[in-house]
Amino acid sequence: MVQSLHEFLEENINYLKENGLYNEIDTIEGANGPEIKINGKSYINLSSNNYLGLATNEDLKSAAKAAIDTHGVGAGAVRTINGTLDLHDELEETLAKFKGTEAAIAYQSGFNCNMAAISAVMNKNDAILSDELNHASIIDGCRLSKAKIIRVNHSDMDDLRAKAKEAVESGQYNKVMYITDGVFSMDGDVAKLPEIVEIAEEFGLLTYVDDAHGSGVMGKGAGTVKHFGLQDKIDFQIGTLSKAIGVVGGYVAGTKELIDWLKAQSRPFLFSTSLAPGDTKAITEAVKKLMDSTELHDKLWNNAQYLKNGLSKLGYDTGESETPITPVIIGDEKTTQEFSKRLKDEGVYVKSIVFPTVPRGTGRVRNMPTAAHTKDMLDEAIAAYEKVGKEMKLI
């Protein structure tokens, strides 16, 4: 007899719970700022991707409200029918200036970007070299393209060179692309873009950088590609509009020719209603803020260094992060989840990250300090880490 849906779900959900892999979802009452409220209790929030605090910025809220008054709450259609508003054109022109490219295209989410852009260019006659720690949306985008997927050891340039050479010299593929995160979200390390570009030029690879955690954070806000001064060397610059930018959506920046192709061939652009007017205007306001000033960027980095130093002094393993992302690596999945719960009891909200998001045995809580945190908040968080760590004999 075949297995019923109930039997399948019950068996597998129980397995997740028994092995410390089941993630309880909390509901936030109010805005997702540096402090949040859950079930009536306030917590210092170290789990959001709201790097610059823009999700609650008054200027962005005013811009969104004004756009709703003039353009309504929805775009009303897909971009290719009559869902392209003047607000979308303004946003894409602003994004292109921000990223130092000829053009840009906005999508409904960062996940959509990778589903859209990869499959619009790569197909079954091509090969994709992909860093083994790339985001799930990259993995799914690669699968959707039906290209040959070749995993590359994480940030291993010797492995990349060898596999690029093998793929190109095999003569089996029309195009070969290398895809990498700009900043890796679980450990906070940065892709070796100068070396990647050198290898790509040697073997004629297309280059694709998903800078979801780099936009607004690296390169004085313009991203990891700008940080290395390689705007004219990377074919695809991908970014989210939901993390440092503080709203929702994603984008691809590149040549006008590339963007024209994506507008003609990328399925999320063709078959999904465009970004809402309020969101679109708020995003444009956020990007202009980053272009006009580095104040929020600088505050983010100062807060990140302060927290990282405090946790390291306590004896925690904070990994090899080169960015504000600050993991505290515990290891065992069940211990990691218990650690997160104990911190929550002390008023610090920092979620556990365990398999399958990270490899087994590398469970961690991932701290995400923002520009909106005060030093008092960070001191309170560090004190909670000291108390819980000693009680659990982790430090």
Swiss-Prot record:
Q: Which residues form the signal peptide?
A: none
**Top EC class per UniProt?**
transferase
Family under the similarity heading: Belongs to the class-II pyridoxal-phosphate-dependent aminotransferase family.
EC numbers, comma separated: 2.3.1.-
| A Gene Ontology biological process term | biosynthetic process
Q: Tell me which UniProt keywords the record has, alphabetically.
A: Pyridoxal phosphate, Transferase
List the InterPro entries. Aminotrans_II_pyridoxalP_BS (IPR001917), Aminotransferase_I/II_large (IPR004839), AON_synthase_class-II (IPR050087), AONS_Archaea/Firmicutes (IPR010962), PyrdxlP-dep_Trfase (IPR015424), PyrdxlP-dep_Trfase_major (IPR015421), PyrdxlP-dep_Trfase_small (IPR015422)
Write down the Pfam families for this protein, in alphabetical order.
Answer: Aminotran_1_2
Q: Which residues bind substrate?
A: H135, T357
Q: Where does pyridoxal 5'-phosphate bind?
A: G110, F111, S185, D210, D211, A212, H213, T240, L241, S242, K243
Protein name (Swiss-Prot/TrEMBL): Putative pyridoxal phosphate-dependent acyltransferase
Q: Which residues form a coiled coil?
A: none
Q: Which cofactor does it need?
A: pyridoxal 5'-phosphate
N6-(pyridoxal phosphate)lysine occurs at: K243
